[in-house]
Amino acid sequence: MSIHPAVGFARVGNSRDAFYFGPDVVGQLPRGPFKDAKGAMAKQAARFRIYGYDAQGRVLGEVTSAEASIEWRVDVANTKAAWYSIDEAFDIPDSPSVPLRNADVVDRSSLVVHATPRRLRGGGAGPLPLDGGDFAGRAVTLGEVLTDERGRLVVMPGSGEAYSVPGADPLGGFADNDGWTDNTCDGPIRATVRIGGRTLEAEPAWVVCASPNYAPGIPAGLVTLHDSVESALFEAGRMPVGATDFTRDVWPIFERITDLQWVNAGYLDSHGFGSLQDWTQQRWRERLADATTVNEPFRSMVADGFRDPAFTEVQPTLEPQMYGDAVTMPPNLVEPRQWLALTPLQYRHLKAWARGDFTDRRRPVVTRLSDVPLDEQPATLDKASMNACLGGAFHPGVEFPWIARVDWLWTSDLRLRLGSTSPDAGNWGPELTSATALSRRGPLSKLGPGGVTQWMGVPWHADSASCRVGYQKALSLVLPGFWPARIPNHVLSEADYRIVVDTDRTLAERRRAFRTRREWERFIAQPTRPPTLALMVREWFKQGVVRDRPGPTDGRFPSRMKVESDAGYDVEPPTEYGAWMWVPQLPMFPFVVANSNDNSLRSVDRRGRQVPLGLSAALGRPEGITRDGSGNLYVCCLDANIVARVTPTGVVSTFAQGLENPVSITIDGEGNLYVANYTTAGWIAKITPSGDASTLVAPSAGLVQPIGLVMSPDGALLVSNAGPGTVARVDPVSGAVLDPAWIAGLDGPRGMVFDASFHLYLGVRWTNTVNRYDVDGNALPITFTGTALGEPFGVAVDASDRIYVSNSARNVVNRIVVSGDSGVVSDFATGLPNPGGIVFNG
């Protein structure tokens, strides 16, 4: 006797009545409902069955309450708050040690929510609540259990709430927030079967109650949980793998990539409908399946576009364009695991396919379990359950953590090994090391209730609402992504979908609507992380779900479309705060500094070494400088009264003219440039990506000698004014001066920059200082030691939040290493001829 699926997944929801089941066969889409009539989120229930086997392991059939007496036992817990912090997966190189969550709480058991174990017998039993647990004295229910009329077990998950202790800090971290927990959970499922005068103990299963699936219309992510577990067993020599079959082993990779077009705008561009690599087009399907020698160069070219899971080199431009286990924000070009790769087994099949070493046995698509041959039904249930969950990146993950790749944690038939009947309250010392975590005598050997979800973010809302944080202005506002197949990035809205399917509208209008993708988080997204997370806790169930919908019948668009549906908001937000605001422009070396005395642009590497850029034409006193996502530099030429564009190859052209002492320039997320014109009646020009210039802030608006510009995290344009010694806030759309003296009392303010913590650093000329402020313009204390600054002008920040300041009086760029409220200043690049603006150009 065995319980199937071996690992079943439920997903939290706050509806009292609405629920649906996950897939029973691979690729099956849940039917919903995904919201109830009041807008609450439906629960995904996990259903477990028992199958009987003969002595040779052959499947005899499903065992139900009609022919047997079945007693189910369910034991689940949530131990997140008692566990350790989440940094990186412990099974990758150089994973750091992590401290306990809530380390100051002595009674660790008070942080464990352990529901009273439940037993059910027969068909139609229950429901019984999974209650009896509490968090710091507050009762927490983890769901309920019941059986259907045939005696199958149904696990209903919790309500999806987050819980905090009095006085807990607001949510701020994506994975670790002391004083908080949620009501996700996991634990073993066991069953005793009495049949034909015999009493048999079924092979146990595991239930995981996870966060919602916000994209039930997407059947699978590129790397599934089943892929990761199967690959781990294969690499350990515990699972034989046969010859590569295109339809079974290779085609899903391309199908899944194409499906991401509905949840990520970058994949719409690269692999979506109408793109050059829409693999689901029949012509591509046939060519991909072509095993002939003539087609080998094509197959090899496609396969070479995928990242090698050996991770021997950094390959940021390859597929998949998703972040990996070791990602940092901003990502660097040192650690290969900053990006996700296929599993080693997937990659093995891909390489075999590229060589032509594959078959293609196409089988009929099965959509119901009853159509699956009996002997394949148990394994089908197991695979379908795990295939609908993500197998990476484990940072920490959506439904399941990195422990999926620990082969000895699994039986050969994909069951988790139960090691303890008690939850683990983090009794492995004040810090958990990689060696302990991976030890066969470590916590994984004691896997018990709560032992899976404890490795996940707490509460789940924080991680789910942080999945856009990596978008970078300097690279792409849409790629890489984290887990779009379950937590969308960009969606086709209901309103745009209605335009697309309306055949009475013009084709141009419909195409424009089809290409429009809205930020999925737009209803809760704020300029900074904490208020976004707070809104997610309150309104997580209002977020739309991406459902499968019929396309128009005229053949000009996909026949099936995946559409954001049931969003619980009456109107669209007035502003969509781009996720790039959470992390400034990707600051990779080298940086480029403009030098006005010799009209040069000099590239400075991470060691401070300088190389003049080769330019096709001279610049007329370069001052301010910025960069677009394609690597073009835009330079304010003070004497020539123009903005020059410098391509990555050094070709210089006039991008905008008719300016008046242009001295500073910045760029927004849409590629618009803003230029400060340094005059007594100062004004700001706005230049579109196509080069159309207009006056954003007129000379009559009251700006006096504007000299520095930066985009604020809340979307405002900040302008430093040398005349009155102020920083003004400006609406970058209307040009209205929102606050002429947002910061005042400065003696020669100049360049500005925000770091990754949203601290504003402002160079002040005549006091030879760099001031620091919070996002509201409040001064923050900071003191400097080391080399003195000399009339600071340009200010930039690198990936480690080190500040770089050009000093026009000393002809150097200084580096400031900030720690807390102090910074150490040193000369970084010397001998520069009157350095001005700085921009990172890596």
Q: How would you describe each model-predicted region?
A:
Residues 617-630, 658-670, 678-681, 700-715, ...:
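Beta-rich, blade/repeat-based domains predominating
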Residues 596, 638, 678-679, 722-723, ...:
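Short loop/turn segments immediately following the C-termini of beta-strands
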Residues 609-616, 651-657, 692-699, 736-744, ...:
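A short beta-strand motif characteristic of beta-propeller blades
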